[in-house]
Each structure stands twice: as C-alpha cells, then as structure tokens.
Amino acid sequence: VKGYDMPVLMNAFGSYERMALALGVEKLDDVGDELREIMKLPYISLQHKMDVVSLIPMAKKAINFPKYVKKAPCQEVVEMEPDLDKIPILTCWPQDGGPFITLPLVFTKNPATGKRNVGMYRLQKYDKRTTGMHWHIHKNGADNFRDTKAAGGEKIEAAVAIGADPVLTYAATAPLPRDIDEMVFAGFLRHKSVEMV
C-alpha cells in the first residue's frame, strides 16, 4: 500500500487450497476427518474396564491448551503513543462507512467467570486513536460487554491482535459451541499449543 512500510495480505482464505495451506493440511477434509475421529472416542467412567492408555495419543492430539510465555514477538515493538494512521487500514467495500480493520482477533473475557473469548469483530477506524467495534448482539464478545455493563463497568477490557497465525483467524470465526475455547481449538488444528502472553 502506497505510503506504508507494512505489507497487507488480502483474501488469504480465498480458495480451498489457501485454506488448506493456512491450516497446515493437504485437504480441508483432513480437519473434518480428524474431528470425526475424536468425536468417536468412547465415554469412560471409573467403572469402565477399557484400556485407557490406548486413548492417550488421540487425547494428546485433541487437547493443546495455550502455553503462556514471558516474551513474545508481539512485545518487540511498544508504541507509547499509538497512531492508527501508521497502519494501512483500508476501505474494502463500496458501502463501508470508512476504513476497517477486517480480520482482527479481539480478546475479551467474561467479568463473572473470567472465561476468554476470541472473536473476529471488524474495527472501524474513526481517527488515529479510536476505533469502533462491530459485533453482532448474539456473539460472545457482545455478551461479555453486556455482562461488564451489568456489573457496573463502562468499558470492557479488550486486546486486539492483527496479523496472527491464520489458524487463530480460522478458530476465531469458527461456529464453536460457547464452552469451547478458541485458543484450544486453534491448538487442536495446529497440533501444538498456541503461545500467549
């Protein structure tokens, strides 16, 4: 983008081949096949005489909790006076009201439970210091905001990540049940824990 020293990636998920590449699989069906395999795991009670040890390899593939680290690449540049004008934020659609950050990972948490949500909510740039969040009323991030307000808060604590691993983008947009953590799902897709700070 003219006038910026930061590259822009567009249409990263624009074909089946690009989606497979982003998810690290040969074919997109591989992801579904693996999920179906995990869903077939039997329920195990303490009274069940089944060989539990045989299930450990599959369980290790299925559950990769986030790994917390002290230092990460996202901490290498710290802007004390953030300026959105330094970032190439584009107006992509003819009817958009202005430039939007289109695929940000928006991290919020529920004030009562502390449960994390990672959603994909477009951010409209209003000026060099301000954005507006576009989330649908039925999304978990919106629930967290309503719960924050109900608890007496005026603002919700949020973090935004731009340019992350495409698996995180995919996980944040996946129609997961409310109790499934997007970062755990991303770990499942990547077959390793996602590093977080």
Tell me what each language-model feature is.
Residues 1-197:
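Extended, highly charged
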